[in-house]
């Protein structure tokens, strides 16, 4: 346990941020998982809608600093490539 006032405050802030980041990451994983499930079943329209939702959540997570911008770009690219493979 910290004794210094500023460190006690820093611990409080870190805990708040950790919980917020955990929530964002969880919803991100859920969105991507739902996309993959739709892609597995071959439902192109549903997968396309879920791809947009997942891409939006990836962008938000990157802008909030929860994940790195390059990681968001790589994941968006992977799901976009999977949607493109439906039409090819």
Curated annotation (Swiss-Prot):
Residues 7-23 have a biased composition (Basic residues). Disulfide bonds: none annotated. Residues 1-28 are annotated as: Disordered. One of its GO terms (molecular function) is structural constituent of ribosome. One of its GO terms (cellular component) is small ribosomal subunit. Gene3D superfamilies: Ribosomal protein S20 (1.20.58.110). GO terms for biological process: translation. Binds directly to 16S ribosomal RNA. Belongs to the bacterial ribosomal protein bS20 family. This is Small ribosomal subunit protein bS20. The gene is rpsT.
């Amino acid at each position: 346990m910290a004794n210094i006032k500023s460190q006690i405050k820093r611990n409080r802030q870190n805990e708040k941020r950790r919980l917020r980041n955990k929530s964002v990451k969880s919803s991100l994983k859920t969105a991507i998982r739902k996309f993959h499930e739709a892609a597995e079943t071959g439902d192109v329209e549903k997968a396309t809608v879920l791809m947009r939702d997942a891409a939006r959540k990836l962008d938000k997570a990157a802008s909030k600093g929860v994940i790195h911008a390059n990681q968001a770009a790589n994941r968006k690219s992977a799901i976009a490539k999977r949607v493109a493979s439906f039409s090819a």
